[in-house]
From Swiss-Prot:
Name of the protein: RNA 3'-terminal phosphate cyclase
GO CC, alphabetical: cytoplasm
Gene expressing this chain: rtcA
Main localization category: cytoplasm
Chain positions recorded as ATP binding sites: Q107, H290, L291, A292, D293, Q294
Keywords, alphabetical: ATP-binding, Cytoplasm, Ligase, Nucleotide-binding
Cell compartment(s), UniProt: Cytoplasm
Entries under InterPro entries matching the protein: RNA3'-term_phos_cycl_insert, RNA3'_phos_cyclase_dom, RNA3'_phos_cyclase_dom_sf, RNA3'_term_phos_cyc, RNA3'_term_phos_cyc_type_1, RNA3'P_cycl/enolpyr_Trfase_a/b, RPTC_insert
Source organism (scientific name): Nostoc punctiforme (strain ATCC 29133 / PCC 73102)
Length: 348
């Protein structure tokens, strides 16, 4: 059984998600202690518990410690990953519901299902656009298109928007199985082609997305970027607002967002998203700090070496690399001076 220290590095949910994915793929039993020890509320929260149960369901795993707040988990796969039709609902993991991020559940099960025999259809319910996690827009416009270049064939369709704190969102994920993963080279991002944006609200007046869109377009044009922001006004279980920007370079993609909240003007929300995008743009890097650690797992499972240049070597990245190396599947080198990550499979 592989013993994993959940408190290692930044001690967050990434250790758990990576471990679950690799346990499902390899069939290796794992024990994780100190889960999310670095967080204010340690242990499994609703989205982590949903990820545990989703990963367990697809490989018929025996679970010990799968409860809210649990800091110790044993996960013993019972079979190879089974493709199929699944539904996972983050809001059912705790009483009173949850807006836990469904993108994090998606990222836990995507690669196991892509490598399985047969196609899968997964309905995920919970938070689609929430802080401190990838949004479904980021998954759709950045993460999946980059993974597609590595051989992953998957599509996500947004059925309903779910914001913090109510959630109530829903997506459908289609995954083609039997993937052979190839490496990726993202050392040069090339010229910026355009910035695409979505300014979206649910249960709020139409002037709010319009103001977010106008402010973002003005700011990015002042910085001499080509930009177009679409406005969306949708139905939802509760009011919510956000703007999500995707920058398309010749060879790479990145995305940033801003979320509305009480006493924060629509213009300020747009400024938050634009500031993040411009900060990344001026680094000249090919890969944003979030994608940097999300790419480690597919690169580990690929037949060729991968290399990519990151905007920042984050603790998340270093932590994730250390977890992956415990499974003995890949050698990961992080050149902190040049900010270049190299991943070479030890099994192919």
């Amino acid at each position: 059984m592989i013993e994993i220290d959940g408190s290692y590095g930044e001690g967050g949910g990434q250790v758990l998600r990576t471990s679950l994915s690799l346990a499902a793929i390899t069939g290796e039993p794992i024990r994780i202690a100190g889960i999310r020890a670095g967080r204010k509320k340690p242990g499994l929260a609703a989205q982590h518990l949903t990820a545990v149960r989703a990963a367990g369901r697809i490989c018929n795993a025996q679970l010990r410690g799968d409860a809210l707040g649990s800091m110790l988990l044993e996960f013993i796969p019972g079979s190879a990953v089974q493709a199929g039709i699944y539904t996972f609902d983050v809001s059912k993991a705790q009483e009173g519901g949850s807006a836990g991020a469904i993108a994090l559940v998606l990222q836990t099960i995507l690669l196991p299902l892509a490598l399985a025999t047969g196609n899968s259809q997964v309905t995920l319910k919970g938070g689609t656009h929430v802080n401190f996690s990838p949004t479904v827009t980021y998954i759709e416009q950045v993460y999946l298109p980059i993974l597609q270049r590595m051989g992953v064939e998957a599509q996500v369709k947004l059925g309903a928007w779910g914001w913090f704190p109510q959630g109530g969102g829903e997506i459908e994920l289609q995954v083609i199985g039997g993937t052979q993963l190839g490496g990726i080279n993202l050392l040069e991002r090339g010229e910026l082609q355009q910035v695409r944006g979505i300014a979206a609200v649910t249960e709020l007046p139409s002037h709010i997305p319009q103001r977010m869109a106008n402010r973002a377009e003005n700011l990015l044009r002042e910085a001499h970027l080509k930009v177009r922001v679409q406005t969306l006004r949708e139905k939802g279980v509760a009011p919510g607002a956000g703007i999500f920007l995707t920058a398309e370079y010749q060879n790479s993609l990145t995305g940033f967002g801003g979320f509305g909240r009480l006493r924060l003007s629509a213009e300020t929300v747009a400024e938050i998203a634009c500031q993040q995008l411009l900060e990344f743009h001026y680094t000249g890097a090919a890969v944003d700090e979030h994608l940097a650690d999300q790419l480690l797992l597919p690169a580990t499972l690929a037949s060729q070496e991968s290399q990519y240049q990151v905007a920042e070597v984050s603790r998340h990245l270093i932590t994730n690399a250390a977890v992956i190396e415990q499974f003995g599947l890949a050698q990961i080198r992080v050149n902190e001076a040049d900010k270049i990550v190299s991943v070479k499979s030890l099994t192919s």
